[in-house]
């Protein structure tokens, strides 16, 4: 267990160096440190998040897709953090439909992911309002949560009986306030919590 902890900490150290190098647009140093992080801990999702950002910055979109996609095998929970970037890497190659389908596939495989907003926004661009709305509704119904219900109410309010509209609007604003309060990041390793 201690060996694992050290590997995790070493990988995080290299990720910090890579993130700093990326911020300074020193992409060679960033890439080197990402590789060191992955050498220390091959399950380091953060390293692939940074690698995807490096590849995107260099215009190497197929490699960005590969880096972001590798997160599924490392820790699928982090896919929520790269959903939009993954789609944009597909889009830069003219493969918007493929990118959208991959995000939908992730939601169907891992219903706990928070990708509903990205999927809805991208489907809206590609398929139009009614198809995007139906897609969002179907995905929310698979595993309802506050974020999904908030989105669902937003989609349904315009079709509602006027007598219900005010109540539905009030429910949506209560859910929205609760969502703002509950957006927390929790580290699975050290249990650190932070408002995102």
Residue ranges, per PLM feature:
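Structural motif corresponding to the intra-repeat A-B loop/turn of tetratricopeptide repeats
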Residues: 24, 58, 93, 126-127, ...
């Amino acid at each position: 267990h201690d060996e694992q902890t050290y590997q995790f900490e070493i990988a995080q150290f290299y990720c910090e160096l890579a993130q700093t190098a990326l911020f300074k647009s020193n992409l060679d140093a960033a890439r080197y440190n990402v590789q060191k992080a992955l050498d220390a801990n091959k399950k380091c999702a953060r390293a692939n998040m940074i690698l995807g950002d490096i590849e995107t910055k260099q215009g190497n979109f197929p490699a960005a897709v590969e880096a972001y996609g590798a997160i599924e095998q490392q820790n699928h929970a982090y896919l929520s953090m790269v959903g939009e970037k993954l789609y944009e890497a597909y889009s830069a190659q003219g493969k918007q439909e493929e990118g959208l389908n991959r995000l939908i596939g992730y939601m169907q495989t891992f219903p706990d992911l928070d990708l509903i907003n990205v999927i809805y926004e991208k489907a809206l661009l590609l398929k139009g309002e009614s198809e995007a709305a139906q897609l969002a509704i179907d995905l929310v119904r698979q595993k309802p949560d506050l974020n999904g219900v908030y989105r669902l109410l937003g989609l349904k309010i315009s079709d509602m009986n006027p007598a219900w509209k005010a109540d539905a609007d009030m429910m949506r604003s209560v859910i929205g306030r609760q969502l703002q309060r509950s957006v927390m990041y929790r580290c699975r390793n050290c249990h650190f919590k932070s408002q995102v």
